[in-house]
């Protein structure tokens, strides 16, 4: 359901027209030491589940975020980010990397690599020394192969300290916690890709 580091104990709802799943955006390995101050723990976006037939992986469980009901229409991105809560849609073909960064040089990276894998990299995304496990390299970067050939679209929803990345019609999802020292204000795209951004309604 999710290839990221921080999605745990997902539950679905009974009596709804759609099969909706919500998870706990955390990881038991370091959940007790998160540098969030006034709160501890948050939930993922609700996701509508479905089966999608993929050319490279056969039938796959997909989760489409219901954020379309929360966010407005996307507008082109010109290099700067509008705040700490937004949805970013990136479309491209082949290899590309998207970087969200701040003035301190901290950056969260995601994209499609040269082997065709979708990946996220929070190795230099901000505070990581609050827990020895969180700081380990194995909790920095993760990737997963695509289930589709050709052009791709990635949707990333960012909400202050949690971001959720969806690709290949929701058959790939990555949930991860990030703790930038100050908000990300810049976006940079390398490769054949373009982006649009949507704000919460």
Predicted regions and their residues:
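Beta-rich accessory regions
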Residues: 1-201
């Amino acid at each position: 359901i999710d290839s990221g580091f921080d999605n745990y104990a997902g539950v679905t709802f009974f009596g709804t027209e759609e099969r909706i799943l919500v998870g706990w955006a955390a990881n038991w390995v370091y959940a007790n030491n998160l540098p969030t101050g006034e709160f501890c723990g948050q939930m993922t976006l609700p996701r509508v589940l479905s089966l999608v037939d993929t050319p490279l992986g056969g039938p796959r469980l997909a989760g489409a975020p219901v954020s379309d009901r929360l966010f407005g229409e996307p507008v082109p991105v010109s290099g700067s980010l509008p705040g700490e809560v937004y949805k970013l849609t990136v479309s491209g073909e082949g290899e590309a990397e998207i970087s969200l960064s701040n003035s301190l040089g901290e950056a969260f990276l995601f994209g499609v690599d040269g082997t065709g894998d979708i990946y996220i990299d929070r190795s230099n995304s901000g505070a990581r020394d609050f827990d020895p496990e969180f700081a380990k390299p194995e909790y920095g970067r993760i990737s997963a192969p695509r289930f589709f050939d050709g052009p791709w679209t990635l949707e990333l929803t960012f909400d202050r300290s949690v971001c959720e990345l969806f690709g290949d019609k929701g058959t790939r999802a990555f949930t991860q916690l990030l703790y930038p020292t100050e908000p990300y204000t810049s976006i940079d795209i390398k490769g054949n890709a373009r982006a649009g951004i949507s704000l919460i309604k």
